[in-house]
Amino acid sequence: MIKLDFEKMGGLIPAVIQDHESGEVLMVAFMDEKTLNLTLETGKTWFFSRTRNKYWMKGEESGNTQEVKEVLTDCDADTVVIKVKQNGPAACHTGNRSCFYVKWENGEWVEHSNPLFDPNEVYKK
Amino acid sequence: MIKLDFEKMGGLIPAVIQDHESGEVLMVAFMDEKTLNLTLETGKTWFFSRTRNKYWMKGEESGNTQEVKEVLTDCDADTVVIKVKQNGPAACHTGNRSCFYVKWENGEWVEHSNPLFDPNEVYKK
């Protein structure tokens, strides 16, 4: 029976969140065993924030939740790819559709930011 | 100027390798600053193996190298997505096209292995 390996990263695994239709990688965050189980049980994506040291559900503040369509793990069971339907206009807290809007071009990182919502409106301080 | 944050994971960042045409996530591995620079300079994917504690180029043994087409980082610059042309039949050392051939189905992980080469042939002991 396959069991996920959380040990390699001290209890966490990377979770690659992919748009189930376009294949675009929307974000990469981290899960522990509890948040992976919450994701599998609720059908919404839950993560462990390394910086805020807390559990969080994607969209708990913004409403931009993610509906789980498919969950895959890899050959050494230490990473997951989760295909989701992204609710709302964007996945990234900056308002960008995907968090991966910075591209390596001619020897430097170039931002291609195109926010689809105003973070100041969505994330009230 | 954007600089990648290797500190969060003690010198490493996750690298999500995606087929540049199909969008399929082929594998997730880890890079340090040196292997990211090698990847950007050589146009082939280089990683740091946490288990073997060494640098490796994808395909150095199998010949299944990966040609870098596009490199993206995210809003907090601590992860990269690299779109590649996969040379040879498969990315995974098991012979599967993608390492993500295990799917969560009805409460358990189910293997959907379909090797496109024989690892015993390709990886001589």
UniProtKB/Swiss-Prot annotation, chains A, B:
Belongs to the PRA-CH family. It is found in: Cytoplasm. It catalyses: 1-(5-phospho-beta-D-ribosyl)-5'-AMP + H2O = 1-(5-phospho-beta-D-ribosyl)-5-[(5-phospho-beta-D-ribosylamino)methylideneamino]imidazole-4-carboxamide. This is Phosphoribosyl-AMP cyclohydrolase. It comes from Geotalea uraniireducens (strain Rf4) (Geobacter uraniireducens). Its cofactor is Mg(2+); Zn(2+). Catalyzes the hydrolysis of the adenine ring of phosphoribosyl-AMP. Its main location: cytoplasm. Gene3D superfamilies: Phosphoribosyl-AMP cyclohydrolase. GO terms for cellular component: cytoplasm. GO terms for biological process: L-histidine biosynthetic process. NCBIfam families: PRK00051.1. Mg(2+) binds at D74, D76, D78. HAMAP family: HisI. InterPro entries: PRA-CH (IPR026660), PRib_AMP_CycHydrolase_dom (IPR002496), PRib_AMP_CycHydrolase_sf (IPR038019). PANTHER family: HISTIDINE BIOSYNTHESIS BIFUNCTIONAL PROTEIN (PTHR42945), HISTIDINE BIOSYNTHESIS BIFUNCTIONAL PROTEIN HIS7 (PTHR42945:SF1). Keywords: Amino-acid biosynthesis, Cytoplasm, Histidine biosynthesis, Hydrolase, Magnesium, Metal-binding, Zinc.
